[in-house]
Amino acid sequence: MAKSNEEPNSNLNTNKPPLKRTKTLAQQPSLNLRVSIAAADNGIGNSSSSSTKTDFEQQQRNYPSFLGIGSTSRKRRPPPPPKPSNITPNVKPPASDFQTKPHSEPKTSPSSSSPPSLPIAITKQQQQQHSISSPIFYLFVITCVIFVPYSAFLQYKLAKLKDMKLQLCCQIDFCSGNGKTSLQKDVVDDGSFSYYILNADSRTISLYIVLFTLVLPFILYKYIDYLPQMINFSRRTNSNKEDVPLKKRVAYMVDVFFSIYPYAKLLALLFATLFLIAFGGLALYAVTGGSMAEALWHSWTYVADAGNHAETEGMGQRIVSVSISAGGMLIFAMMLGLVSDAISEKVDSLRKGKSEVIERNHVLILGWSDKLGSLLKQLAIANKSVGGGVIVVLAEKEKEEMEMDIAKLEFDFMGTSVICRSGSPLILADLKKVSVSKARAIIVLASDENADQSDARALRVVLSLTGVKEALRGHVVVEMSDLDNEPLVKLVGGELIETVVAHDVIGRLMIQCALQPGLAQIWEDILGFENAEFYIKRWPELDGLLFKDILISFPDAIPCGVKVSADGGKIVINPDDNYVLRDGDEVLVIAEDDDTYAPGPLPEVRKGYFPRIRDPPKYPEKILFCGWRRDIDDMIMVLEAFLAPGSELWMFNEVPEKQRERKLAAGELDVFGLENIKLVHREGNAVIRRHLESLPLETFDSILILADESVEDSVAHSDSRSLATLLLIRDIQSRRLPYRDTKSTSLRLSGFSHNSWIREMQQASDKSIIISEILDSRTRNLVSVSRISDYVLSNELVSMALAMVAEDKQINRVLEELFAEEGNEMCIKPAEFYLFDQEELCFYDIMIRGRTRKEIVIGYRLASQERALINPSEKSMTRKWSLDDVFVVIASGE
């Protein structure tokens, strides 16, 4: 029985570790562990996890350290308990333990006492062993790949040495002493390093190198992520921190290299070409009988021309040459791709407007709005006299989109080139890209945002312009949306800044047109470059003349004022007749173009006898505002200055009355301090008929249809509301006419007659004046086709003013005075103030008669014509005048 118990021990001892491990196991209290395992197999109890862990730790200490298993630097999971058949024979427990305690169970923790933990522990141990053995396996594979060819090379070299020894022995036996000396010298030469490189057997080494180079990328791609583990294993370090795989890091570095360096693709192509030539030359050297230099040359020819391999002979040489030719085709395809990408990128850069503009004395427009079309048109007309010019547009839009929008204008630019660039006016680099410092004029357009945001952006653009290191050559014209923001922009920009407050200008012009019908057309002619416009020039030959003589000195122009040099360049419009032109003074005129007029000899004029009629007194008027503008408080102040006492201003809009009072008070308007007008509030929608019918529309002298503040951001919506309100008001007025005859009624009853409806609206227009604020010039045809309204083109007039100030910044002061409620103003006067009916006079005679009223006559409109003529060409030609004719004058507002 004892013998049978010792046999298993002897078998086990043949496979167990050294004696140290056996001694260590004997010293540990592992009896309970073995009993528990045996009991677990018999259904008696479970194993103890704590004792298992202790036994596993003792086993770890006995493994060699280079395997990394016995390291205590990292906490390892305990291995599963060994099978009872292998453990129970090792240490035989006393029989008394089995007899006295047949059902005793060891004390175990609740977490480790469950039987299912054994398979999990076995699986984890297998995974751990696999993770440990994998780097060793990969290292073994790589070592074999590297050293197997090298061992073959050493064997080859050993064989060569043996052959050489045999040859030397044979030659020594049959040669003389002198031959022996020379033979030893030859042997030494043949045994040099160049011998192994140049002899035929060195081609085998080249073949091994080629094969190894072909296999190496696949091995690296497959197992490169295990390289850090091998390094840690060689350094005997263990790191638990998670790291990015090496394959991803390499891909990231390549990506960064190609992204940062602009010539990375070209360098990569050059490296690939050189590598293919060298690799192909080495392969050709291995399969052919030529030299290395010849093989490299053939490799280059195969890369450069894929057809050169057609005459090769031999299977190996053909395979190599075809492979090199295929690589050469790939190289040239990559080269063509790079060239194509470079050309496409350059063309795309030009197409997207990223290139630099190298121009001088050009007009630079910053921003994009619906006013740009009419602005370009006016600037092109202004440049017509000089054979055209250059206009550069910088906006935050795509260049193609801007060019398409400009092409839709269908306007002949008459030699003017329009260059579009995509960029932000707030970025200095983009401003330098359009040669901002060399522009003769810079126009900053208002954005499509609300007034405060648009003016804030304009202020930032002005700050960017002031930050340009090179001094600006030209002046800056800024389109403002709110009059309150104008002083801040001028404060920041200084003397270079000229502002045009578009909203305020249109509001003042609407009031002037409402009080004097037809004035809108006159302002279009004066502000636009198609007809007559303002010019200021120095004429030394006029020094010493009185202004009344200067007035008739220009056959093709009409003098309107003087720029006084002694008063700091102040422009005086409509000066006194006795003002003497001094040295340095300049003359303000209205002319066709800046090169179409010059002073001439004084003509013969006759003042003669004419009626001395004073201006009729002003009578109270009744005016209606349909809509709400954000600067309506300024318009009320202008009306307060123009209207007679007792006038009424009706305000009809959707803004509640209390909110109106708060807005007017915020605009610093004292409603109770108004002396000439009385405010009447009505609430309603101007596009709803029943709301309009509640108003006495037939009693108003003037009706102003304003672009409502709620829809002013949308040009189409605003114009649609204005047009609908205009038609509704005219229709309501025509139905309320007291002199409507029965004929028109029968026409409406028998069937709708468009002409009769238009005729009734024209009759209503004779009773009251309607001024519509139209934002889009295309809406002009819808309003002017029936002549039912005297209209104002807001964007058209603002664009004209911007273009005129861009051409000459001094004109801005002239426009400011003519638009103001004080000082000189543009007026339309009847002919009875200057002549008798059917009197024959020349235009010079009428100009002299106008000076008696302190007025400057600049044009006229005949009763038989629809449009006024400003700056007539033949001023000395006499003609008959009618009392139905009217004259356009610049008169003092005092």
Curated annotation (Swiss-Prot):
Effect of residue 351 to I: In sym8-5; loss of function
Residue ranges of coiled coil: 390-415
UniProt-recorded Gene Ontology molecular function terms: identical protein binding
Pfam families: Castor_Poll_mid (PF06241), Slo-like_RCK (PF22614)
Keywords tagged on the record: Coiled coil, Ion channel, Ion transport, Membrane, Nucleus, Transmembrane, Transmembrane helix, Transport
Keyword Coiled coil: yes
Record membrane topology: Multi-pass membrane protein
Domain RCK N-terminal: start-end pairs: 360-501, 620-769
Family per similarity comment: Belongs to the castor/pollux (TC 1.A.1.23) family.
Function: Required for both rhizobial and mycorrhizal symbiosis. Involved in Nod-factor-induced calcium spiking. May induce a change in membrane polarization that activates the opening of a calcium channel required for calcium spiking. Might be calcium gated.
Quaternary structure note: Homotetramer.
Miscellaneous comment: Can restore nodulation to a Medicago truncatula dmi1 mutant.
Protein name: Probable ion channel SYM8
Species: Pisum sativum
Gene: SYM8
